Design a protein with these regions (language model features):
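Boundary at the C-terminal end of the N-terminal hydrophobic targeting segment
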Residues: 7, 12-14
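N-terminal soluble domains immediately following signal/targeting peptides that reside
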Residues: 14-163
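N-terminal export leaders
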Residues: 1-2
Length: 163
């Protein structure tokens, strides 16, 4: 017989990491600080079940999307040095495939120079949750992108922006 390829099939052991991504972006044209949170829909539904008391959450329902948006709003903050947390306006949420997006924004005259960030999203539900916050304050210039990560018992982290 000729040389063949033997392929063994093993049960899939892949496990999706518990992670969320937030993008904080300065929109210079609109003078807006825009915040976009991206969560895995299943993880968000578990959070709604455990933290909001919804027996069977369904993120295709607008009511459950609104409750998730309020959950996210309560667990994420941006605070300028020596100031109070920014009053981010909650815009809403939308489901796209396996992910749910929550949107916030705030009108400002100029982008902040520095921020203290707290990100407890899903960290009260999953012990191994890892949250990444990316900051784009310079129109997408990769040299000016800043990143913070939150896991375990992390509290506020600080970030500064150079232009």
């Amino acid at each position: 017989m000729g040389g063949g390829l033997l392929a063994a099939t093993l049960p899939a052991q892949a496990h999706r990491a518990k992670a969320a991504l937030t993008l904080v972006r300065w929109n210079a044209a609109a003078k807006l600080l825009e915040v976009e949170h991206k969560l895995h829909a299943h993880d968000a539904e578990v959070a709604l079940s455990q933290q909001a008391g919804i027996a069977t959450p369904d993120l295709s329902r607008l009511e459950d999307q609104a409750k998730l948006a309020l959950y996210v709003e309560a667990r994420f903050s941006l605070t300028p040095p020596g100031g109070k947390p920014l009053a981010l306006k909650l815009l809403g949420a939308e489901l796209e495939g396996d992910h749910i997006f929550v949107y916030q924004e705030l009108a400002l005259q100029a982008p902040p120079q520095a921020l203290a960030v707290e990100d407890g999203i899903l960290r009260d539900v999953f012990r191994t949750q890892l949250n990444q916050v990316n900051f784009d304050m310079a129109g997408g210039d990769p040299a000016h992108i800043r990143t913070l990560t939150f896991n375990g018992q992390d509290k506020a982290e600080s970030v500064t922006f150079d232009r």
